[in-house]
From Swiss-Prot:
GO MF terms held by the record: 3-methyl-2-oxobutanoate dehydrogenase (ferredoxin) activity; pyruvate synthase activity
One Pfam family per UniProt: POR
Reactions it catalyzes: 2 oxidized [2Fe-2S]-[ferredoxin] + pyruvate + CoA = 2 reduced [2Fe-2S]-[ferredoxin] + acetyl-CoA + CO2 + H(+); 3-methyl-2-oxobutanoate + 2 oxidized [2Fe-2S]-[ferredoxin] + CoA = 2-methylpropanoyl-CoA + 2 reduced [2Fe-2S]-[ferredoxin] + CO2 + H(+)
EC number: 1.2.7.1, 1.2.7.7
Protein name: Pyruvate/ketoisovalerate oxidoreductases common subunit gamma
Alphabetically ordered keywords of this record: Oxidoreductase
The protein's assembly and partners: Heterotetramer of one alpha, one beta, one delta and one gamma chain.
NCBIfam families, A to Z: PorC_KorC (TIGR02175), PRK08534.1 (NF006321), PRK14029.1 (NF010632)
Class of the enzyme per the UniProt entry, highest EC level: oxidoreductase
Gene3D superfamilies the record matches: Pyruvate-ferredoxin oxidoreductase, PFOR, domain III
Length: 185
């Protein structure tokens, strides 16, 4: 089983990203779970969402405390949240950032085995005209992890967002897929 934890801020689409990733894996014949963790969040407050993907039925119903993959939609969270808390040995961190590998590693409390970086915000601004990074970061997830194919991500995005909005979001995911840099540490 692969367990993914998303860290974002209210209004950035972390919950939608977790759901779209689950749908992409489902389209590939996997068993999936996706769910948010809500406190008294408001727009801009830290939000956590989760996705589980497996080849067999998933019976666990708890939050993900020891993720294989951590996805950070908002790089400012690296200063306030321990995004690597519980990260499994051999785990991966995927960050939306324009910073260098060294700058990001300085902010992580635990060094991951792999680090993937992409400037998902710039991609979202260029393609969507908004700094909503949830679909672009999924392109990075597809490239860095290989959990799902980028084509499945694009299809799941188009299932979630209709018409031109779906096409633009799928394009943002593809662009991030192509621009993501993965480091073995």
């Amino acid at each position: 089983m692969i367990e993914i934890r998303f860290h974002g801020r209210g209004g950035q689409g972390a919950v939608t990203a977790a759901n779209i990733l689950a749908e992409a894996a489902f389209l590939e014949g996997k068993y999936v779970q996706a769910f948010p963790f809500f406190g008294v969040e408001r727009r801009g407050a830290p939000v956590t969402a989760f996705t589980r993907i497996d080849d067999k039925p998933i019976r666990i119903k708890t939050q993900i405390y020891e993720p294989d993959v951590v996805v950070v939609l908002d790089p400012s969270l690296l200063d306030t949240v321990d995004v690597t808390a519980g990260l499994k040995e051999g785990g991966m961190v995927i960050v939306n950032t324009e910073k260098t590998k060294e700058e990001v590693l300085e902010k992580l409390k635990k060094k991951p085995a792999k680090l993937a970086l992409v400037d998902a915000t710039t991609i979202a601004l260029e393609i969507l005209g908004l700094p909503i990074t949830n679909t672009s970061i999924l392109g990075a997830v597809a490239k860095a992890t290989g959990i799902v194919k980028i084509e499945s991500v694009e299809e799941a995005i188009k299932d979630t967002f209709s018409g031109e909005l779906g096409k633009k979001n799928a394009k943002a995911a593809r662009e991030a897929f192509e621009k993501t840099v993965v480091y073995e540490l």
